[in-house]
């Protein structure tokens, strides 16, 4: 046991030694932010680009992500280039190395730890490769290690991402109130007239995103049904969003039953969804991509959350000037091994209605 503790101590000490000492000058450098997961995850990594641009205005920020998140990344004014991981992983090793090396990057930040990306970055000869010391494969693939553990952290995901920039001149902690200024989520494409014409200038246009494709605990269709029933129709125009598959599930219960509701599920590309949300007065959803899109755009975003760690709002709440969330103030882990969550379902439609009504002019 003593030997294990000693090895653990040396392991951590070495991690700190390998960490940056002082602020590295990245002015004029090409910096890759690697985050190859979902929409919400990518959005919460965008402030990293904003911070880098503030510290080093002439640096070039390249985002390594997946093709399906490309519209998110291209909406960010602080990102200069997008590079698709999907295309790289299709190639053989030699071509993959060549393609990554051709970016002429000076540094790569492994925000979402992925062994294949880390190994490729080393083989491509990227000079500075930054990863967290908590991932064993980073010890052999990175030459700069950051002491950062997300599992038990009390910080928000966006704050944890920004901690990776401390050794590049970033602050040790950014408050949730100051992070929105770094999103740069402003390059929104124009909304097509047929879609724009669906909006009501006299009512509150509310986008409801009831499902999550299993990525989050859900409020429940029954709760959404009751909410649609009690929201005043003279004050709200309701839109439903989701994939086509989700639309098949919710139409009989939320659209056919309430003919005044406009069904947008399966009808919008991600580019169009971003534009559409930018014209919404508010978005209601669980911890999903559309919720984080709304928050980053500065629209009213109301998230419905489970209190269980690590999916609680302390880690994944929407961040924005008009972002809010509802969660039961209790500790519970009953849904740890199942998708249905009693806590989030116990948030009443009346509570949600009351919160939304506060946003009316």
Question: How would you name each of these model-derived features?
Answer:
Residues 29-153, 272-275, 282:
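Active-site and donor-binding regions of nucleotide-sugar-utilizing enzymes
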């Amino acid at each position: 046991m003593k030997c294990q503790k000693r090895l653990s101590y040396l392991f951590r000490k070495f991690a700190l030694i390998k960490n940056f000492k002082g602020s590295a000058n990245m002015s004029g450098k090409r910096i890759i932010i690697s985050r190859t997961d979902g929409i919400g995850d990518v959005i919460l990594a965008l402030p990293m680009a904003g911070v880098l641009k503030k510290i080093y205005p002439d640096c070039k920020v390249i985002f390594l992500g997946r093709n399906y998140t490309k519209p998110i990344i291209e909406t960010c004014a602080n990102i200069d280039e997008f590079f698709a991981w999907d295309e790289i992983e299709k190639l053989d090793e030699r071509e993959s190395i060549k393609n990554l090396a051709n970016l002429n990057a000076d540094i790569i930040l492994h925000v979402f730890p992925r062994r294949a990306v880390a190994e490729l970055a080393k083989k491509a000869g990227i000079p500075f490769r930054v990863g967290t010391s908590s991932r064993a494969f980073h010890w052999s693939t990175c030459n700069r290690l950051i002491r950062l553990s997300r599992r038990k952290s009390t910080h928000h995901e966006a704050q944890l991402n920004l901690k990776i920039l401390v050794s590049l001149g970033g602050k040790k902690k950014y408050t949730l109130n100051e992070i929105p200024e770094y999103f740069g989520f402003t390059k929104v494409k124009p909304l097509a007239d047929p879609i724009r014409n669906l909006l009501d200038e006299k009512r509150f246009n509310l986008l409801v995103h009831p499902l999550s494709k299993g990525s989050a605990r859900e409020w429940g269709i029954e709760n959404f049904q009751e909410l649609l029933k009690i929201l005043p129709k003279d004050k709200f125009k309701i839109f439903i969003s989701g994939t086509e598959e989700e639309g098949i599930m919710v139409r009989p219960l939320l659209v056919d039953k309430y003919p005044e509701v406009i069904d947008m599920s399966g009808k919008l590309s991600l580019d169009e969804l971003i534009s559409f949300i930018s014209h919404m007065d508010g978005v209601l959803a669980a911890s999903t991509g559309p919720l984080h899109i709304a928050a980053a755009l500065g629209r009213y975003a109301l998230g419905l959350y489970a209190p269980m760690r690590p999916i609680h709002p302390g880690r994944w709440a929407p961040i924005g000037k008009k972002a809010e969330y509802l969660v039961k103030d209790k500790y519970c882990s009953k849904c740890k091994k199942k998708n249905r969550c009693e806590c989030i379902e116990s948030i009443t439609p009346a509570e949600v209605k009351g919160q939304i009504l506060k946003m009316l002019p």
